[in-house]
Amino acid sequence: SGVEVHVEVDTGMGRQGVRPGAPLDELLEAMRQAGVGLDGVFTHFCAAEVAHSELTQAQERRFEGAVGQVRTKGLSPKWVHAGSSSSVDNPAQDSPWLVELAKSVGARAMVRSGIALYGYCLVIEGGASVQPRVRPALKPVMTWKTRVLDVRDVTAGETVGYNATFTAAGPMRLAMLPVGYADGLRRELSSTDAKPGGWVMIGGQRAGIVGRISMNLTMVDVSGIEGVRIGDEVVLLGDGVTADDHARLAGTISYEILCGVRAG
């Protein structure tokens, strides 16, 4: 048919792909009969960010077996890939292993760097002795901005936001932003009287989030930033505030923060 595909082998992720052994043999035979070519074979590690992971080592062995099946069938894919951004960053993962495995079927090795293209990568788990290979050099490239919708003053004792979770301790100047959790600004970044929340950047300075983030509105403290006006640019993600900052406050990972940003 002239069609060529990449076949995913489920070596332990348990999500998608064909299992090694008989299921893989059956798929390769069905592809042969249908005239479908094998351009690549790959797998996905479930714990790539964990140093010296026994799970990853077991997956590597299963993938070696699967590539061996491909070789036994006399197939010559162009690509063999099993790496993610965390695989590239994790010093405990043996990069030459993948290269040699690819060579065994006359293929080239490839890594699938996804989140690293945005300048982010999960912290490698495994103790202080583990030195990441690429994470220190990464720089976030995604910027998310909005503009000041309104500016208002509040006096001591006034409350701000739903359920009055924030009470002004003294006079404050607040800026209202036309963005909220419907746009991907996580509600966990809200602040209360007892707990500071997240922040945005206005004029190169931090402006802390005040009260609860609403569906499409957020209040921030600009008391210490001189001359804030309606229409001023506000950085939600960028210089001075990263997806890692949001993730830490929201109890999640930068991947979820970046995927959650929606165009207004």
Task: Write out the residue ranges for each language-model feature.
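Active-site loop/helix belt of alpha/beta enzymes
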Residues: 1-4, 9-147, 154-155
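Small-residue-enriched segments and motifs
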Residues: 146-148, 207-208
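C-terminal accessory subdomain/extension
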Residues: 153-264
